[in-house]
Amino acid sequence: MIVLVVNSGSSSIKYQLLDMDNEKVLCKGLAERIGIPGSRIVHKKAGEKFIVEKPMPNHDEALKIVLEVLKDEKLGAIKDFKEIDAVGHRVVHGGEKFSGSVLIDDEVIKAIEEFSYLAPLHNPPNLMGIKAIMKLLPGVPNIGVFDTAFHAKMPEKAYLYAIPYEFYEKYKIRRYGFHGTSHRYVSKRTAEILGLDYNKAKIVTVHLGNGASIAAVKNGKSVDTSMGFTPLEGLVMGTRSGDLDPSIVTFLMEKEGLSAEEVYTILNKKSGVLGLSKNFSSDMRDIEDKALENDPLCRLVLDIYEYRIAKYIGAYAAAMNGVDAISFTAGVGENSPITREEICVNYLSFLGIKIDKEKNNVKGEERIISTPDSKVKVLVVPTNEELMIARDTKEIIEKGLKQLEY
């Protein structure tokens, strides 16, 4: 079965074509600068990189060009569009309705549109991608895989905010969580690597990219996660503040004469690592390099970043009444030995965690980095959201399902 995976953003579209009989990536790429001058496709096939420069005024045109590339004699991997059996789409917000991946029909599209008020930056471009593919590949089934779905069945005690209950009833203000596809892939893979029964294991997954979140996965279900109503809650991120006292918002509005929208932009785009480092960088690689050169501010930023992560891991060990494994993933999680080591050694030794320095000296590679006698296993598990989306797509098509429950 050939599956095309599409992740449609506001000005870019990531795509991957997979042969699901052997889970092999046939080719992949990124259409960037959609609707902006200088639009192009960066395409990869068999380790080779190709640049296709073409005007892409909108998502329809961008995906049309992507499909042409997939069929191209030199760049592509198929001879005819009929070879594409299904398309899997990343959709950011599924609200409370979707707790699993779904076969997309008019009703599902309507629901995604309804949830757009919860993810105004993400759901509309996700929908543009879905609608464009439906036009370009009529008759090919489309599957929606939601970032929120894995967390949708968190218990009420984990997802409700302690604000008047009517706001939950009126506006569905609650904790939703994000990065669900990544947390699901990494937790499942962790259980496989360790030979644990996924449905009986207690796993903490630590997704550290420019956006970052942690999940507590107990018996194969997400029981808590650090992001909330929006991806602003939780950890210190590249440009997001993470947890803070909400009264800071009204305080800044008053003292700086700012609108709610302006404060929101500050907390989302100008805070986190970027804000703490006095606008030096939002990239943890830059912060780490300077911290290792004994720059006091960058050392402090790294300390704050790690401290917040360690607190959440400790909290989730309590939430699950124990922990079998902790897995680091995404850009920073996969590629920063120092962050992993400092979190585990400085804060988590009380859990009986011991890190093997040599094994931890790994970047972007699947590996157990704890010692054999470590009571809790610590791993690096590179995430693979596209594969997870493709697997869900295959399962729904093969089993003739409308919705796949996790």
From Swiss-Prot:
Q: Which residues bind Mg(2+)?
A: 7, 385
Gene Ontology annotations for the cellular component aspect, listed alphabetically: cytoplasm
EC number in record: 2.7.2.1
Q: Where is this site: Transition state stabilizer?
A: 179, 240
Q: Give me the residues that bind substrate, please.
A: 90
GO MF terms, alphabetically ordered: acetate kinase activity; ATP binding; magnesium ion binding
Q: Name one GO biological process term.
A: acetate metabolic process
Catalytic residues, chain numbering = 147
Keyword Amino-acid biosynthesis assigned:
no
Task: Read off the Pfam families from this record.
Answer: Acetate_kinase
Cross-referenced Gene3D superfamilies, in alphabetical order?
Answer: 3.30.420.40
Q: Where in the cell is it found?
A: Cytoplasm
Q: What is its main location?
A: cytoplasm
InterPro entries membership: Ac/propionate_kinase, Aliphatic_acid_kin_short-chain, Aliphatic_acid_kinase_CS, ATPase_NBD
Its domain of life reads Bacteria
Which residues does ATP bind? 14, 207-211, 283-285, 331-335
The cofactor note reads:
Mg(2+). Can also accept Mn(2+).
What assembly does the database describe for this protein? Answer: Homodimer.
Family, similarity comment: Belongs to the acetokinase family.
Query: Its function?
Result: Catalyzes the formation of acetyl phosphate from acetate and ATP. Can also catalyze the reverse reaction.
Q: What is this protein called?
A: Acetate kinase
Which organism was this protein described from?
A: Thermosipho melanesiensis (strain DSM 12029 / CIP 104789 / BI429)
